[in-house]
Amino acid sequence: MDVLELLRASATGSYTALFSDAWCQYVSKQITNSMYLYCALGVLSMVFLAWFMYFKRLARIRLRDEASRSMSAVNSSSGGDLRGLRFRKRDKMLFYGRRMLRKMKNVSGQMYSSGKGYKRRAVMRFARRILQLRRDNMPLEMRTVEPPAEYLEETIDGSDRVPPDALYMLQSIRIFGHFEKPVFLRLCKHTQLLELMAGDYLFKITDPDDSVYIVQSGMINVYISNADGSTLSLKTVRKGESVTSLLSFIDVLSGNPSYYKTVTAKAIEKSVVIRLPMEAFEEVFQDNPDVMIRVIQVIMIRLQRVLFTALRNYLGLNAELVQNHMRFKSSTIMAPSTHSSQCSRQTGSQPTLGVPAPTCSNTTTTASPTTANTVHSGLAGANGVIGQSRPPISPSRHSREEHTLSDPNPNPDVINTSVGGASGTSMYAEVHGDAPNVDVFHQQQHSVGNLSTRRGSISQMAPDLGPALSQPGLGQGQGLGPGVTGAPPLMTGAPASKIDMRLVHASAVDSLRKELGLPEEDSHIIEPFVEVRELEPNVTLITEGNSDDVCVWFVMTGTLAVYQANQDAARAKQQQEKNDMLIHFVHPGEIVGGLAMLTGEASAYTIRSRNNSRVAFIRRAAIYQIMRQRPRIVLDLGNGVVRRLSPLVRQCDYALDWIFLESGRAVYRQDEISDSTYIVLSGRMRSVITHPGGKKEIIGEYGKGDLVGIVEMITETSRTTTVLAVRDSELAKLPEGLFNAIKLRYPIVVTKLISFLSHRFLGTMQTRSSSAAPGGPVEANPVTHKYSTVALVPITDEVPLTPFTYELYHSLCAIGPVLRLTSDVVRKQLGPNIFEAANEYRLTSWLAQQEDRNIITLYQCDNALSAWTQRCMRQADVILIVGLGNGSHLVGKFEREIDRLAMRTQKELVLLYPETTNSKPANTLSWLNARPWVTKHHHVLCVKRIFTRKSQYRINDLYSRVLLSEPNMHSDFSRLARWLTGNSIGLVLGGGGARGAAHIGMLKAIQEAGIPIDMVGGVSIGALMGALWCSERNITTVTQKAREWSKKMTKWFLQLLDLTYPITSMFSGREFNKTIHDTFGDVSIEDLWIPYFTLTTDITASCHRIHTNGSLWRYVRSSMSLSGYMPPLCDPKDGHLLLDGGYVNNLPGQLWRYCRASMSIAGVFPPFCDYRDGHLLLDGCYTNNVPADVMHNLGAAHIIAIDVGSQDDTDLTNYGDDLSGWWLLYKKWNPFTSPVKVPDLPDIQSRLAYVSCVRQLEEVKNSDYCEYIRPPIDKYKTLAFGSFDEIRDVGYVFGKNYFENMAKAGRLGRFNQWFNKEPPKRGNHASLNEYTFIDLAQIVCRLPETNAGNSADIFSEDEDCDGYISEPTTLNTDRRRIQVPRAGNSLSFSENEMDSDVELDLQLDRKTEKSIHSAATSVARGSMRSREFHKLEQDRSVEITRLKDETERIMAPTNLDRKGDGQEQEKEPEQEQELETEEPNQENTEVEEEQRNQGEGNEDNKENKGGAYNETKN
């Protein structure tokens, strides 16, 4: 706020305008140019004091005279002199005793007339009450509690009790999945101990690669050998770590053991190594085939999540991960159309890190069968990024240059081609549209990706095809190279009419049989599942991230192109390019699509036909059926994937590690050697620094996709912090040696890291200067407020947790894909025994898959400490503790147990308030003080439907309709959703005196522009306006209160009465405090609807201070304490003196106190003393008048900063090296000379005070997270409060035009849009059906189903209370179907699931179908007799049982609790009838319904046991 023209006030009447303006100008000039006024004020004060003392003494003399006259009258009447008389001591004691007894009657509590020491106790109670009077009058303070030691320290348990060799063994083979104890003991029998001296080789080139090595003591160096004889270290293996390649493990199991070609391991010092031969696993797998299947699946998952995630997303390697150039198996099939393609295909593989690429001659060579069998052509179909992948690192223009290192004559089509034009039509829309029996298994598809399998020799197909395929003269086939003549018609682009399709199908069956490694006598197994299709150019087979169209494709003719999304979407958009880039081609004789068959992931590639092609394919469900009969094809599929990978991937497999960390375990510790970096695959990490004094402080937190320790590894410095796991986490470890080897071979890696580190350092520089003040809360550190998993815990049973979760889910859907999980959902999806220890691997894998597919996953806990609740605690990044704001704040036993179980997880409190109440949040401090473990709180205003008591069925039915509507982005649920996903929008209001009325107009413009406000911060007048908005959230009420306060500030006669002797300030601040206190009352910052902070200048600690809790009016007053006019506010917390925060940052208890503190203009109002610590607080504008940087540190992703402060004149006169005051006086008074602009002494002092504020303001203007706005209000003075309406209108008009221009320019989307508004596509949106984890061991080996037939009996009472079953059907779609709605129109988990999950497809004959339709219609109208309907239901149950038995013969049993779903189908028509005939007495109706459901469940248990589609009967 300005110091100049402080006493000037606008005239209240037109007839006094001239006089008041002249008087104000005169007074302002006197204040500016001389000190006479100060002396005059002092003299007036002394005269007033003397006058007051004189009249007070005169009044005392009068009273004394009257008393003497009265005494004289008494003496005269009594005839004696009473001057010497006095009270006796006994009379005095009696008098004072009676007075005390009268006061003792007011003491609370019963006075006992007997008992030892009762009088003493009564007196002590009375004294205690008197002593506590002042403490009770003080406002309630927030209790500051240091976080527990476990929050910042790693867990150290008794793991030393396990023998070291067994412990290291367990940790090393954990990468193969979960092993039962007998299996582990059998593996231990095959271990060998190797003792190596320094310099001894553990293994070297040409040694067989057939063992797993675990270092028990010492150190081993793993390095690669270059062609010139030099070596390059990959990693150093220390105690407890292992050396192995999972890709070699698959080679050994498939019967093709390899040897070390470039990798060598040598002991650095004396070491002891445990050797576990891979053959030991073969022996175990023979007796436990399910273990083999699970190990293969785990290896494939690791291949996706670790290798592809690390190498692609962070190092920028894409096409280098697969062998781009493959050779044909037969000379009759030569697809390349250019010499370079033929040449590159002869090389057969990518170069390794240490071996240069081979060159090819100009002659075309035919690959031999042996060589062709060596090089497999599968495709690694996914990169491990599941669902909505994290924002990838953008490749530069040089992303293709590394190919020239391995191929001197690269094919431009292969290397530098990007996709253009349309993406092509869908394969299932154009290719499969008119074919019968296409969608046989379409309804049963899960989320899987691409898989590579071995190719069969196409030349071997010709003898089986008869004379039709050996006719010469058919010419060149499409897609074949020039000079390739006489190709069989099957392998050409000849029209299908010229070829017998039966022969084509037979050829396709034989080829796919060989690819799957099946003998010839097993052709009948795959023959029914093989389909052949003709493709036109640019037809899309599958898109990246899609799981619906997953198949194994075999290319018979033509060419398929494999693309991947361009990671630098912004650069591609600027260059008008497509976001897809070519990875490689798939030629005739090769297969593609299938890694997800083993992992359950979606496709990471987009596959299109390059030209006219013919492909044979097998759908995913058919592959699983074949696996069930021939489990060994899993090895063939896995071996095909491995052989397709480039040697670079195999070398990286030796160095990259997959690390599992339980909650509390440390990744690395402070001061350790930095020899690697880590990639967070799942979970959450916390970085903690230990200061020399032993104090620990949080530096930051890392979530999924973040790099940890990269800066220290690159700079080769020791670890500066300790990083520990907040919850169970998975990480990929990238050693420094591997990183150096890759960057030497592929310079693109350096470009990637420079881009990554530049963004990280830029963010650090922008937030460094605005870190929290000393003594600030832990959460004030720059912690990433973006969570992947959220656990919801009710405080009491009265909390409507299910409706709350639905509302939060609804709001989160506006941001991205989200999933809601409950214990019933998980049981129905995976079985009732899923929470047992034996199913740990399956459960964690399934949950990890769901988390990867969604931006956020909601875990709804039970109301008791069940196994599911404990699992939610382990999986959660943050825990939301939900309570009723009007209820009791006491902590229950269940809540304390949660704090004990999740000691390190961040917890936030959510208080719910009904919309019908007119009250505002109150007593929030009592909630927070009772829960010191809570780091943040949210006030949520709930609609009426949340608190309406309904059965679970009615809740599901209600929200199935609510989800079809658009969420209200201005609601508290949307605000909470944006906070959880890191999309909060902050509003920062700067200081500027009366010009702050423009904030009201800007608030109205922001509201009309549809921009939600999630957080508010303010300084000086901005603190006042921001606090009004957070308290009211109604622009009309805010305008009214702001106008009333401005009118009070125009009453200059009240301010004159507040004048005081100007030692500290000109005004005492009493009247100013009263105006702010009357505006807010005794409201605390914690009780505001919207998170709020104000900033003040702490002159006690010489820093700015951020207030997020405490007295509102006090800190607002302190932030407005302009120096010289008001005294600093004394902080009651620590006694520090606080001034206007604008002195350090001019844009940023009880509410009014900190508002007052933020308005303490130095010199005008005294500093405000903080009641907590006694610090003196002044106006925040002295340090930061627009604290947008503070808002960014508190978690706001997008910020709108409004600046209304004054601007200094920078056009000053250059007067030379010295300055004479007499010369300035002459220039000032001489009208014939040009005026000079030289700052006077007060102006210089003001500019010095605002130095840091101006610097901070420039940083805010240049930041990328802030939208800086300055309305045109420079013509209004600081104290022009009488022009409130005019200034407000200026701000409104300017803001409205500003946001309209932003909308036209397309820049408004970041404030009100966070996702693509296009309608959701089924292939790209998360559905619980689509991403169900596929346990191959259970499918293939017929393991006992965890969801046995009696699972419906266990949960029969709950089936009608939860309608979230997501069940894929396994029935053919070429038959007639009837869609029966499930109970309650179950709420889906995504937009596309609303179509697929709500309806259950049943296959019925015509008669039953017609009867069911008739029955459903009659029930809906309430006109059908129960007996007739029950008879039809029995008929339907029999029909469903028959169909179930029929489909079970061809399909593997699903992991769904179908019986529970069947019960829901049975009850749904009855519940529809109940809704229409519902009696007013809802309570009795619900009791009758519960009894009827129990009766139905009991009868069902007797009637149907073990059936998968058993139905209930009344």
Curated annotation (Swiss-Prot):
Bias type Low complexity, positions: 356-374
PNPLA domain boundaries: 987-1153
A molecular function GO annotation: lysophospholipase activity
Pfam family, one: NTE_Ploop
Matches recorded under Gene3D superfamilies: Cytosolic phospholipase A2 catalytic domain (3.40.1090.10), Jelly Rolls (2.60.120.10)
Motif (GXGXXG): 991-996
Membrane-topology descriptor: Single-pass type I membrane protein
Entry GO terms, CC: endoplasmic reticulum membrane; plasma membrane
Topological domain spans for side Lumenal: 1-34
Biased composition (Polar residues): 337-352
CDD domains tied to this protein: CAP_ED (cd00038), Pat_PNPLA6_PNPLA7 (cd07225)
PROSITE patterns in the cross-refs: CNMP_BINDING_3, PNPLA, UPF0028
Binding site for a nucleoside 3',5'-cyclic phosphate 2: 515-644
Substrates-to-products reaction catalysed: a 1-acyl-sn-glycero-3-phosphocholine + H2O = sn-glycerol 3-phosphocholine + a fatty acid + H(+)
Motif (DGA/G): 1140-1142
Basic and acidic residues composition-biased segments: 1425-1449, 1456-1470
GO BP, one annotated term: ensheathment of neurons
Motif (GXSXG): 1018-1022
UniProt-annotated catalytic positions: 1020 (nucleophile), 1140 (proton acceptor)
EC number: 3.1.1.5
Phosphoserine: modified positions: 457, 1234
Keyword Protease: no
Keyword terms: Developmental protein, Endoplasmic reticulum, Hydrolase, Lipid degradation, Lipid metabolism, Membrane, Neurogenesis, Phosphoprotein, Transmembrane, Transmembrane helix
Role: Phospholipase B that deacylates intracellular phosphatidylcholine (PtdCho), generating glycerophosphocholine (GroPtdCho). This deacylation occurs at both sn-2 and sn-1 positions of PtdCho. Its specific chemical modification by certain organophosphorus (OP) compounds leads to distal axonopathy. Plays a role in the signaling mechanism between neurons and glia that regulates glia wrapping during development of the adult brain. Essential for membrane lipid homeostasis and cell survival in both neurons and glia of the adult brain.
Family under the similarity heading: Belongs to the NTE family.
Protein name as it appears in the record: Neuropathy target esterase sws
Lineage: Eukaryota, Metazoa, Ecdysozoa, Arthropoda, Hexapoda
